[in-house]
């Protein structure tokens, strides 16, 4: 392996880790293994701290391929709690409002999900990395400032209802770059004349890379020790 020339690695991001923390940890182990102070390492698509699953990490010259990977179709398994919302649309923030769910049936859920298939407009969450006048939306939101984000056009190829244990549902979503599953949860809640927030999220696929192809961050140092590494010549 030649991490400077460029390698593409697949990881299962651990729960509560930021994407940035995963990149830092992988960079640390690679630098330590190679005996160098720095090497380029980047990820091809952020996952929220409360999400787990497929994360593609590129090293060295392969970081030029990051944009290519970002455009790959993604698949998620999401668990939604109906009848309650949070400001972040997931469990990062406390419940701020509750709504009735007595009227919701499996048929109603199936029907609502169908409305989101195809090209849709989605307003990103204010607790997101979207930029407003050059500043991250989440930085402004955490300061208590009002944040207005514009709707983005995206494509949802598939939505499948996997489990329906009302008021909780589990769905599989296949979607394009830029889709916020947290925002989709919010919109599904509204489509059901209720509210909803995300209680679990796993990214199961990015392009052809599946969860079973991924290394754990924990096992990476051991895996690294078993690889044949090309020596890095400091320029």
UniProtKB/Swiss-Prot annotation:
Catalytic machinery residues? 48
UniProt keyword terms in alphabetical order:
Isomerase, tRNA processing
The terms under GO molecular function for this entry are: RNA binding; tRNA pseudouridine(55) synthase activity
Q: Name one Pfam family in it.
A: TruB_C_2
Quote the EC number.
5.4.99.25
EC primary class: isomerase
Q: Which GO terms describe its biological process?
A: mRNA pseudouridine synthesis; tRNA pseudouridine synthesis
InterPro entries xrefs:
PsdUridine_synth_cat_dom_sf (IPR020103), PsdUridine_synth_N (IPR002501), tRNA_psdUridine_synth_TruB (IPR014780), TruB_C (IPR032819)
Catalytic reactions on record: uridine(55) in tRNA = pseudouridine(55) in tRNA
Q: Which domain of life is it from?
A: Bacteria
Record family assignment = Belongs to the pseudouridine synthase TruB family. Type 1 subfamily.
Q: What job does this protein perform?
A: Responsible for synthesis of pseudouridine from uracil-55 in the psi GC loop of transfer RNAs.
Which HAMAP family does the entry link to?
Answer: TruB_bact
Protein's UniProt name = tRNA pseudouridine synthase B
